C-alpha cells in the first residue's frame, strides 16, 4: 500500500545561506514528487525559499506555528515534542524532517515508508563521538534528516495513562521519608507527575533524544531500525567510514555534511 508522506522543512530566518540554498535546491530537485511543507511562523518573509522552489516547479506549502518556537534551539525542540505539531499533519502517514543542513541523494521516500518504522535517523556513535575517536555505532538516531510515523507520535502524545510502574516509582522517590514516598507513589500510579504531558513539560534536551532515548527509558519504545540498518537511510558523523560500511553506496540522505568531513569526503558528491 502506498503511504501518504510529506517533507517538512523548518525555517526560521529570511536570508538563506549558500549551504542552505544547496540543501533546498537538492530537496526540490530530488523530492519534487512529494508534498513539501515549510514550517515557520507568520511574521517571517519566506520569499527567498519560494523563489528557489519555483525554479523546480515545486509549490511549498506554508504551515505557521507560534513564533517562540523559532527563537532558538530550545524552542524548536519544544515544537517537535508537542502534540500540536504532529496533529497538524495527521492526515498523512509519514513526515520526513528535512532541516536545511541535510542533503538527499535520490528519492527513496516511499521505499522507507513501506518499511513501517516509527522513526529513522542517522545512527549515533557511543557518547555522540565518532569512529575516529574510537566509538562504536550505538543507536538511531539524528533528527535533522529523519522519517517519522505521524500516527505513532500522535498516539504517544495523546496517551495520558500513567507510565511508570510501582517499582520504578519507588526508585524515583527512594530518598523521601517512607510515608511521603508511599503517598507520592500512590498518586503517581494514577498519573500525578507520571503521564506524557508531565514528561514533555519537564524535558529540556534535544527533541531527537526525547524520542530515541528518553521515552525508551520510560518504557515507551518506537519501532526503529538497528544503527547498521539506518546507515543506508542517513549518515552524519564519520561519513567516510559509514560509506565504506555501506558497501561504498550513498545513503538516501545525510545530515550536517558541511560540518563533518566536507573537504575530505563529501565534496566529491556535494558541490
Regions found by a protein language model. Name each.
Residues 1-25:
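N-proximal low-complexity "stem/linker" segments adjacent to membrane-targeting elements
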Residues 9-13, 38-42, 121:
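Short beta-strand/turn micro-motifs composed of small residues
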Residues 22-26, 46-57, 211, 215:
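Short, aromatic/basic amphipathic alpha-helical patches
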Residues 24-34:
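Short, acidic, metal-binding catalytic loop of nucleotide-sugar glycosyltransferases
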Residues 39-93:
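Active-site-proximal specificity loops/subdomain of glycosyltransferases
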Residues 92-104:
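Short beta-strand-to-loop acidic/aromatic patch adjacent to the donor-nucleotide binding site
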Residues 103-134:
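Conserved donor-nucleotide/metal-binding helix-loop-beta segment in metal-dependent transferases, i.e.
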Residues 141-270:
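Catalytic core and acceptor-binding pocket of nucleotide-sugar-dependent glycosyltransferases
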Amino acid at each position: 500500500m502506498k503511504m501518504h508522506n510529506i517533507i517538512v522543512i523548518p525555517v526560521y530566518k529570511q536570508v538563506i545561506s549558500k549551504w542552505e540554498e544547496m540543501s533546498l535546491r537538492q530537496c526540490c530537485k530530488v523530492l519534487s514528487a512529494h508534498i513539501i511543507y515549510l514550517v515557520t511562523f507568520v511574521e517571517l518573509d519566506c520569499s527567498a525559499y519560494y523563489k528557489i522552489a519555483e525554479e523546480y516547479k515545486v509549490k511549498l506549502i506554508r504551515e505557521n506555528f507560534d513564533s517562540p518556537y523559532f527563537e532558538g534551539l530550545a524552542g524548536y525542540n519544544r515544537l517537535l515534542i508537542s502534540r500540536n505539531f504532529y496533529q497538524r499533519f495527521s492526515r498523512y502517514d509519514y513526515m520526513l524532517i528535512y532541516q536545511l543542513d541535510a542533503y538527499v541523494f535520490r528519492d527513496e521516500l516511499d521505499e522507507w515508508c513501506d518499511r513501517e518504522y516509527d522513526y529513522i535517523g542517522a545512527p549515533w556513535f557511543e557518547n555522540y563521538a565518532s569512529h575516529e575517536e574510537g566509538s562504536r555505532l550505538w543507536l538511531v538516531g539524528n533528527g535533522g534528516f529523519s522519517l517519522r510515523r505521524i500516527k505513532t507520535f500522535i498516539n504517544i502524545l495523546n496517551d495520558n495513562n500513567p507510565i511508570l510502574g510501582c517499582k520504578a516509582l519507588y526508585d524515583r522517590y527512594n530518598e523521601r521519608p517512607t510515608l511521603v514516598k508511599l503517598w507520592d507513589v500512590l498518586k503517581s500510579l494514577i498519573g500525578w507527575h507520571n503521564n506524557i504531558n508531565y514528561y514533555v513539560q519537564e524535558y529540556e534536551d534535544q527533541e531527537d533524544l526525547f524520542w530515541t532515548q528518553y521515552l525508551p527509558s520510560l518504557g515507551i519504545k518506537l519501532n526503529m531500525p538497528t544503527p547498521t540498518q539506518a546507515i543506508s537511510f542517513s549518515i552524519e558523523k564519520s561519513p567516510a567510514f559509514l560509506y565504506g560500511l555501506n558497501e561504498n553506496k550513498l545513503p538516501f540522505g545525510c545530515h550536517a555534511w558541511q560540518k563533518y568531513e566536507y573537504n575530505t569526503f563529501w565534496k566529491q558528491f556535494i558541490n
